[in-house]
């Protein structure tokens, strides 16, 4: 009797500790999630209010009941966010086009027109003006395509990261719910054991005198055997509850380990992705400055084309009669799949097998090299720079 009561009390203490620990951890996770949501909404509201200071197309709601004008509460109506975002996107497209036009004109006047030898243009139909205008349009389209591709890539990465974060958050919430359900099952089992123990104690106390005063030894043996069977049943119940408590400890440790591992993995992935993105942007900037911005009309690259659906880049080398075609194996993690060097010979275009084989052996399926480095190396070797 005393041993059984002590065991039940120990179980209750352990279950209470586990339940409190899970409740505290669950509340902390929910508070962190709510805090992140509030911070996100605050940043969105602050951004919209900042835009509203200089633009009239965003109209945040204000609490007009307050007498203090400067202290009025400002918030954003979520129902109008979709329409306002569309208007904002249209304005951003116009601003982007205007910026590209101004930037193109700036480079055009800076690197094309001479300050000492002004062009003698009769009208807009002048052949020289038409040719320069076409060149400006081509450059503008190339720059726009590259920037849009980068924007779409970054948007896709943001969406993927947000989706993964949401899945991990849902998984943590589900684990806490499952742990809470297991705790409730343990309490039910413990209460059942307590009721059975109390009932057995009452039966044993009520039948004690009858068993001792009975002259029938067979009845005494039968009662003893019955009680022994009940004790075996209670022992099995005790073993089952002990096993469930052990499983609950494992669930708790698993939740803690997954939480710590999730934080480490998220931090590592973010650092790796940011480092790789910065490296790609730096290589693209250097390549663009070297072959387009700094040289201007004297650039060695002509007819630069990007085929996004095919994962292919193609361009020509000025005054060298070379056409270079580079195919990628994967757009998400681009690796060189094939490099083809074509050479113009008379009226025909033939494949330079030796040069193609050389560059393929050097760069094919190389994950450590960026496509801009490959293009720069090919141009340098073919032009002997």
Curated annotation (Swiss-Prot):
Q: Name one GO biological process term.
A: kinetochore assembly
Subcellular location per UniProt equals: Nucleus; Chromosome, Centromere, Kinetochore
The alphabetical list of record keywords is: Centromere, Chromosome, Coiled coil, Kinetochore, Nucleus
Q: Does the keyword Nucleus apply?
A: yes
Q: What happens when the gene is disrupted?
A: Inviable.
Q: Which InterPro entries match?
A: Kre28
Show the GO cellular component annotation of the record.
chromosome, centromeric region; kinetochore; Knl1/Spc105 complex; nucleus; outer kinetochore
A Pfam family it matches: Kre28
Q: Where is region (Contributes to interaction with SPC105) located?
A: 127-201
**Which domain of life does this protein belong to?**
Eukaryota
- More info: Present with 377 molecules/cell in log phase SD medium.
The entry's family comment says: Belongs to the KRE28 family.
Q: What is this protein called?
A: Outer kinetochore KNL1 complex subunit KRE28
Species of origin reads Saccharomyces cerevisiae (strain ATCC 204508 / S288c)
Q: Which gene encodes it?
A: KRE28
